[in-house]
């Protein structure tokens, strides 16, 4: 059997499979279906400083080869995540977990990361800079190298845990943003978040999503994700976590060849709740098929 282990920012993973934030809850919900310790780790639901009720419904729409969501970062806030959600997780998951953090100001991000820094089970902070900047006209932090770097630097000041910055694909030059985050002290980069999409109901001529637009994810964005992972991994010296349309062991191999150290699986969890477990179990056979002895050896192996 091939070696599935990888090292992500100094922490060893049994395998590179990571259910993506927003598609796996706080983990314990899936523990009723299978042993989630089979996973490398997972990124729990996006956490903000204060509780958020999310966007009005409908906030999910089916699309060709994917889906659109505009959930709006619904979560109980960092204090309840620490006091209620993480204790439940500790009973069923015995590995470091990735904490996904969102915010609407630099201060929001720093506060939430500082609170999570004290949690022993949190191994990495995945900082989602795709959120709108309430003090910057609503523009996403992740569309500006300077703004993304500012958040990175602020978070690095309040934590000793590895900081992975999650980037938006809705930009013209994702490489410059990744490099700005690296220069500001980021320990890793994860990409891509969802692409901006929209559907319209032909009967009432209104957007299907109450928020009008939302994040498009699923198999259709996989080639875009592979391209961006390849570009970023060739431009930075820190680890890259690849995601976007991944749904099979073959997709994982392709993403790693593009330069990903670990791979997140998002929308596919909503189609098949066992998909991440199945990918972990399928990897040895796929590795044998392509004569791969160790996954860590193929990272960035695309010629």
Model segments located where?
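Short acidic/polar active-site loop segments enriched in Thr and Asp
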Residues: 39-40, 45, 95, 122-125, ...
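C-terminal helical cap(s) of enzyme catalytic domains, especially alpha/beta-barrels
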Residues: 55-64, 200-214, 256, 268-293
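Short donor-sugar binding/catalytic loops of nucleotide-sugar-dependent glycosyltransferases
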Residues: 246
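Alpha/beta enzyme core
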Residues: 83, 106-241, 250-265
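Short gly/pro/ser/thr-enriched loop/turn and capping motifs at secondary-structure boundaries
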Residues: 48-53, 132-134, 196-199, 270-272
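A short, charged, Gly/Pro-tolerant segment at domain boundaries
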Residues: 296-303
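N-terminal capping/small domains of soluble enzymes
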Residues: 1-97, 102-104
């Amino acid at each position: 059997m091939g070696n599935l282990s990888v090292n992500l920012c100094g922490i060893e993973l049994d395998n590179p499979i990571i259910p993506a934030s927003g598609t796996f809850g706080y983990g314990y919900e899936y523990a009723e279906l299978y042993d989630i310790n089979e996973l490398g780790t997972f990124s729990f639901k996006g956490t903000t400083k204060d509780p958020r009720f999310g966007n009005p419904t409908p906030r999910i729409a089916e699309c060709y080869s994917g889906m659109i969501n505009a959930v709006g970062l619904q979560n109980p806030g960092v204090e309840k995540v620490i006091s209620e959600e993480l204790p439940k997780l500790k009973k069923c998951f015995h590995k470091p977990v990735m904490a996904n953090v969102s915010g609407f100001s630099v201060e929001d991000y720093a506060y939430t990361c500082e609170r999570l820094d004290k949690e022993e089970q949190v191994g990495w902070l995945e900082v989602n800079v795709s959120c709108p900047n309430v003090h910057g006209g609503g523009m996403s932090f992740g569309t500006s190298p300077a703004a993304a770097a500012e958040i990175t630097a602020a978070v690095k000041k309040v934590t000793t845990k590895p900081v992975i910055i999650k980037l938006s694909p809705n930009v013209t030059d994702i490489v410059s943003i990744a490099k700005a985050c690296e220069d500001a002290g980021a320990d890793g980069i994860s990409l891509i978040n969802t692409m901006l999409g929209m559907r319209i109901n032909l009967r009432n001529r209104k957007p299907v999503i109450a928020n009008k637009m939302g994040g498009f994810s699923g198999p259709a964005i996989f080639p875009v994700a592979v391209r961006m992972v390849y570009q970023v991994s060739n431009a930075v010296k820190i680890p890259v976590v690849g995601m976007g349309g991944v749904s099979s062991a073959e997709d994982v191999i392709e993403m790693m060849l593009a330069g990903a150290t670990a791979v997140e699986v998002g929308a596919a969890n909503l189609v098949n709740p066992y998909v991440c477990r199945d990918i972990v179990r399928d990897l040895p056979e796929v590795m044998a098929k392509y004569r791969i002895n160790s996954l860590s050896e193929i990272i960035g192996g695309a010629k």
